[in-house]
A protein has these predicted regions:
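Conserved acetyl-CoA-binding loop-helix of GNAT-fold acetyltransferases
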Residues: 87, 93-106, 127-132
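Conserved beta-strand in the GNAT
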Residues: 64, 70-86
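Conserved active-site alpha-helix within GNAT-family acetyltransferase domains
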Residues: 98, 122-139, 143-148
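A short beta-loop-alpha structural element at the N-terminal edge
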Residues: 6-26
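A short, internal acetyl-CoA/4′-phosphopantetheine-binding micro-motif in the GNAT/acyltransferase core
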Residues: 82-93, 119-120
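Conserved GNAT acetyl-CoA-binding A-motif
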Residues: 108-121
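A short helix-loop-beta-strand connector motif used in the catalytic cores of GNAT acetyltransferases and
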Residues: 53-64, 81
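Conserved GNAT-fold acetyl-CoA-binding loop/helix
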Residues: 29-52
Length: 163
């Protein structure tokens, strides 16, 4: 059963940049471990934290989901690609992922081509999430294009409206 909670979707706060990057990396790592067991992380925890701070938070358009001051989700976009959409374990099923996706699509410039996302083929929850929100499968990969070497599924959608 999906329960809606009061979620605040926002941008990164410059004055809290380092702390937010660290909290987001903690949430991201926990989410990957819990929701994608068996998918290896090719980086150490320190490397992942540096990537969140130095790449995701500085080069991508980022939105954070917050409940009562706690970061419970993150989404980032680089051009047409939705690069990350993670919800903290224990917070899935509350509409947070949908709200983050909606914010990312609304944030995309009107001239941005069709939004795209790639998921690991074994991540049935992510595939179902995007398919239920209007994304359609347009291709697969054998894993040679990602650091995890996991087969993937690529999706795109023709509209930015998310129900």
């Amino acid at each position: 059963m999906t329960t809606k909670v009061r979620v605040h979707i926002r941008q990164i706060r410059c004055e809290a940049f380092a702390a937010e990057a660290d909290a987001t990396a903690t949430m991201y790592l926990a989410s990957r471990r819990m929701l994608m067991p068996g998918v290896r992380n090719p980086h150490t925890e320190a490397e992942t934290r540096a990537w969140m701070r130095d790449v995701v938070f500085t080069r991508h358009s980022v939105r954070l989901a917050e409940v009562d001051g706690e970061i419970v989700g993150v989404a980032s976009r680089d051009g047409v690609w939705l690069m990350n959409l993670y919800v903290k374990p224990g917070w899935t099923g509350h509409g947070i992922g949908t709200q983050l996706l909606r914010a990312m699509l609304a944030n995309a410039a009107s001239s941005t081509p069709v939004p795209r996302v790639s998921t690991f083929a074994r991540n049935a929850n992510a595939r179902r999430f995007f398919e239920n929100r209007g994304f359609r499968a347009v291709g697969t990969g054998d894993g040679s294009a990602n650091e995890e070497h996991e087969p993937d599924s690529r999706y795109e959608r023709s509209t930015r409206d998310v129900s």
